[in-house]
């Protein structure tokens, strides 16, 4: 059985703020990005059936499954927003950086604790695992399992020689199409115009995706949250940077 960071435990909730009760990011600082090709050490399942989702979601029902995946979830701001917007859905954040994923795990634990003290049951529908989604996504999800996937402010890998490391490429798009159900959506957001053009070009070239219309984008209740729910998005807003949004439907 695969163990998770929740199972391994951050029960002590150290380095938390006395005011908010939430973990403080200054104790979890790490480089902005991580090399996805490097041989990191991960504990990953051989197949989706081997994942013990109940270790991540205390209230999961027998017929329930993860439907939303935030790939490269960073410090978990958008993941928390998903949990609040869709209390009946299970959302998973996947993050490659160990300290950052530890922070998200501790953040969720603290939010659950605060909610419990108020006789609430919030945030038990979100979780985070440390993994390399570029390598192990099909190990976690069955064919057609996901309803929504999010790629928000991914590493742009500016150097041409590193473009192959970008999380949107033709080979990976086929893997995403495998775990995404027909009619499911892929949300992409970046502040780098070159990366945005790369994403749109590769998604348009793939036969299993179509870009939704600007009207559909504006009517999606998630769209406004994409701009500053995540920590990276909020930083772009503070710096008065540009946002480039593109949403695609699995066909």
Curated annotation (Swiss-Prot):
GO cellular component, one term: nucleus
Subcellular location: Nucleus
GO molecular function per UniProt: tRNA (guanine(46)-N7)-methyltransferase activity; tRNA binding
One Pfam family linked to the record: Methyltransf_4
Record keyword tRNA-binding present: yes
Main location: nucleus
Entry EC number(s): 2.1.1.33
Active site: 155
Keywords of this entry: Methyltransferase, Nucleus, RNA-binding, S-adenosyl-L-methionine, Transferase, tRNA processing, tRNA-binding
Keyword Manganese: no
Residues at which S-adenosyl-L-methionine binds: 72, 95-96, 132-133, 152, 230-232
InterPro entries attached to this UniProt entry: SAM-dependent_MTases_sf, Trm8_euk, tRNA_(Gua-N-7)_MeTrfase_Trmb
Catalytic reactions on record: guanosine(46) in tRNA + S-adenosyl-L-methionine = N(7)-methylguanosine(46) in tRNA + S-adenosyl-L-homocysteine
Record pathway: tRNA modification; N(7)-methylguanine-tRNA biosynthesis
SUPFAM superfamilies in alphabetical order: S-adenosyl-L-methionine-dependent methyltransferases
Family as reported in the entry's similarity comment: Belongs to the class I-like SAM-binding methyltransferase superfamily. TrmB family.
NCBIfam families for this protein: tRNA (guanosine(46)-N7)-methyltransferase TrmB (TIGR00091)
HAMAP family: tRNA_methyltr_TrmB_euk
Function in brief: Catalyzes the formation of N(7)-methylguanine at position 46 (m7G46) in tRNA.
Protein name stated in the entry: tRNA (guanine-N(7)-)-methyltransferase
Organism: Drosophila willistoni (Fruit fly)
């Amino acid at each position: 059985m695969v163990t998770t960071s929740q199972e391994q435990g951050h029960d002590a909730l150290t380095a938390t703020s006395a005011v908010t009760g939430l973990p403080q990011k200054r104790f979890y600082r790490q480089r902005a990005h991580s090399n996805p090709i490097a041989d990191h050490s991960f504990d990953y399942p051989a197949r989706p059936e081997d994942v013990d989702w109940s270790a991540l979601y205390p209230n999961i029902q027998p017929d329930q499954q993860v439907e939303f995946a935030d790939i490269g979830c960073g410090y978990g701001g958008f993941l928390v927003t998903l949990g609040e917007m869709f209390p009946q859905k299970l959302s998973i954040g996947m993050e490659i950086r160990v300290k950052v994923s530890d922070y998200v795990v501790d953040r969720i634990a603290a939010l659950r604790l605060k909610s419990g003290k108020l006789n609430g049951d919030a945030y038990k529908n979100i979780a985070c695992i440390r993994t390399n989604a570029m390598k192990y996504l099909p190990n976690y999800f069955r064919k057609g399992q996901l309803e929504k996937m999010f790629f928000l402010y991914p590493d742009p890998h500016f150097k041409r020689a590193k473009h192959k490391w970008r999380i949107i490429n033709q080979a990976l798009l086929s893997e995403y199409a495998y775990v995404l159900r027909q009619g499911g959506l892929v949300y992409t957001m970046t502040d780098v115009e070159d990366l945005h053009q790369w994403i749109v070009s590769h998604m348009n070239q793939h036969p299993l995706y179509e870009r939704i219309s600007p009207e559909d984008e504006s009517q999606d209740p998630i769209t406004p949250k994409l701009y500053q729910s995540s920590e990276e998005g909020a930083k772009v807003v503070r710096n008065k940077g540009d946002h480039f949004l593109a949403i695609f439907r699995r066909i």
